[in-house]
């Protein structure tokens, strides 16, 4: 597992690229309070290397000079900051019924977002023009695109399996890169939520589970600050875990899956995904209380299993489920206490402060990290 908040010094084979990432990360985290001398001290790089890289990034529009720092007996140092004005990364959330697309600054601030109805069977034909339209509306240059998908994204960057999209070994990233002309990077939707939660966290090495509940159900696991994806990148595929609490038929064809009891359409009693409802409106009234109680028992059973297995105590619910109000959380907490009173005081469950936007932010964060080495911290909630 690679820490999501640590970038080490380079090995000889990739010295320049890694040193650029190291410098840019420290400048970004400094938020206008670091000078070239500070970067030398923080990174351990020599003065000539830092001066050369800063000059290069100033010319490219990635870094800017923002003023003078306090003098310590000599010439005041020139302070540096990430230049957040010229570039954007795009985040895309892919669902069964359509897409959400957002343009974000290099600090993770959402500049523009929109929803697009589309058939997942024709992903590229719908998504490519939508991305091109968003890009054309901006006065910034697109560096890269991050796409969150409901399925396993393997080490090759392929969708190795997605029940909801009915795809196996699908090179969506390669297809989009070819048609768009931008680098495109894929990430599992629950892993994207987990990345966003790490960026929000005050803890430099948090341990948590981001449980995405939308068309499907999945978990993103962060252990001591590192995203855990497993040997074949399938860690967190809990939607088709059979907890033996019901016999409902799942989209995968089996019965008893967590997803069959807890996906958003079951919780609301609505056949269509909540992803396509108007934004900015609370929808507590859509929560089906009977279904919510049943889903809560299944979710509580999962939280208990994860706690007992790997000692993850904090769970953050992400995705469309965040719009369902406090009722579902209360049912989950009650179920935890009923199962084992001890657990009620040791397992915490809450909605993400990012709401729906966590998946988009995590997808865009993936693009920013892959292209520039930036690890977002203190993103806006």
Language model segments and positions:
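Glycine-rich phosphate-binding loop and adjoining helix at the ATP-binding site
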Residues: 110-207, 327-338
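ATP-binding/phosphotransfer module of carbohydrate and carboxylate kinases, centering on a glycine-rich
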Residues: 1-68, 72-117, 121-141, 201-202, ...
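Short glycine-rich anion-binding loops that position phosphate/pyrophosphate groups of nucleotides
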Residues: 69, 150-153, 214-216, 321-322
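Short, acidic, Ser/Thr-enriched surface-loop or helix-capping motifs
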Residues: 105, 154, 222
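Acidic-glycine-rich active-site phosphate/pyrophosphate-binding loop
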Residues: 173-174, 228-230, 235-243, 333-343
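Glycine-rich phosphate-binding loop of actin/hexokinase-like ATP-binding domains
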Residues: 205-261
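Active-site nucleophile and cofactor-binding loops and adjacent substrate-binding regions
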Residues: 43, 163-165, 185-191, 212, ...
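General beta-strand structural signal in soluble alpha/beta enzymes
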Residues: 65-66, 184-188, 221
